[in-house]
Amino acid sequence: MADSVPKAEGFQPQDWFPHNPDAHGTDGPLHIEPAPVYPIADCFFESFQDKGLPYRPDMFSSGETANGCGHAMRSTFKGSRTTAADYITKDQQRSNVTIMCDVTVDKVIIERGPNNSLRATGVEYLDNSGKRYKAKANYEVLLAGGTYNSPSMLLRSGIGPRQDLEKLNIPVYVDLPGVGKNLQDHQLIFTYYEVNKPGLTDDERVSHDPDAWANGLKEWQEKKSGWLATFPFGAFGFARLSDRLDRDVPEWRNMEREEGRDPMGLTDAQPNCEFFHTVCYGGPPEYTDFPKPGEFALAMCVFLCGQRSRGYVTIKSTDPFEPPFADPCYLSDKRDLLMLSEGVRWANEVVTEGKGTRDVISGSWPRGATHHRKKTNEDWHEHVKKYASTSYHPGGTCKLGQDDDPLAVVDKYLRVRGVKGLRVVDCSIMPLLMSGHTQMPAYGIAEKAAEYIMQHNKHRSAGKHKGSAGFQQGARL
């Protein structure tokens, strides 16, 4: 994966940012740049360093440390966000790719061949009126529906746990117990604090001005600048916290662990939590208590890495328009609660004791809240249970694994077990969610899949090759 991710990146260096050129790609379609630094971010960088996180500007691209602070990259350049759409539009547009919008894939078409072998030959999909169509695959079908929809499509296709399929009267093609299992998601918690000094946050532009949104949108539309064109977060950090738990929490200290790993299963080279802060008030879950003119607030955010809780995704019916049912089973493993609580505890120490922030933070927000006074790991448990939520980083539900892994759905080439001509290409294939954000790994998975497909098809002449997933709209059924 390390050689695949940079292929997606078109890094845009900035004079102020000391980047590591070996950690970035320059020719990819995604325009990537470091986020600009707000005044409040300088305060947090000082506090992070005061609390033991060395400053490593490009650490989130280089992967050089699990204990440091630096700058996050963003897929925004000159005020515009770049996305996967840039692979198939603009300079990357290709004549052999047909994009169909406002359609919903129901299932993969599977046909039996010699010796009862199975092959994916296309998909069935519906338009918004419910009319059903077929698309034929010349070579392969690639599912890229994401962690929730890829397993749903497999289940409706008859690929998944036999008992789940039979409950819905879906003919079973392949009994794959792991489809929809192993759901993981980084839990994220926003904890709010009051800032007592004007000019550090962006609240004047965001909360205080009743016309802020209209003016911000107008500025962005006309100039691609302003607060809607930038990144609402500041300094970022990674930290190892297991030693703190060993010191202060007997339950953690007595937990089983493999040699060289903490109870989360992580080594010293892997962070336990990520930390960052907003540059104004805002964030889940309530979107209330916005500061009035003369008031300023922000959130300190803690993001759990290496979570041990596992959930699942399934379908309740064969209706492709019915959303899948997902239960992430957050905090079902006690280790997650202890570690996330420790992350929030340490973050609170950064905010209230760190050299750069202690004099500009008045206490908790909204006024009257007292969470800034919490001291022990246990003190934070109820806060974490109440406020921890999703970071929208799901993965794992079409797990990649060895043949002897009963929950493996795809092999190392991303091919679905038991069916030829079918791959899954998205974050659902991750056996373990990485200790970081999923955006660039998702592109890396796609780049790696492209390599596999080209290797598989290299014997075909370029003149006859029509694309590994050359879907063509078929007749209405």
Task: Outline where the language-model segments fall.
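Intrinsically disordered, low-complexity domain-flanking/linker segments in eukaryotic proteins
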Residues: 5-18, 114, 122, 248-264
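Conserved redox-cofactor binding core of oxidoreductases
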Residues: 1-111, 119-120, 191-194, 202, ...
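Surface-exposed beta-strand-to-loop junctions
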Residues: 21-29, 64-70, 164-166, 319-325, ...
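A structural signal for well-ordered alpha-helical scaffolds and beta->alpha junctions
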Residues: 37, 41-42, 80-84, 158, ...
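Structured beta-strand/loop patches that form or line metal/cofactor-binding pockets in enzymes
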Residues: 285-305
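Short coil/turn segments at secondary-structure boundaries
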Residues: 10-16, 58-63, 84, 198, ...
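C-terminal structured subdomain/cap of oxidoreductase catalytic cores
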Residues: 96-193, 197-198, 298-356, 381-477
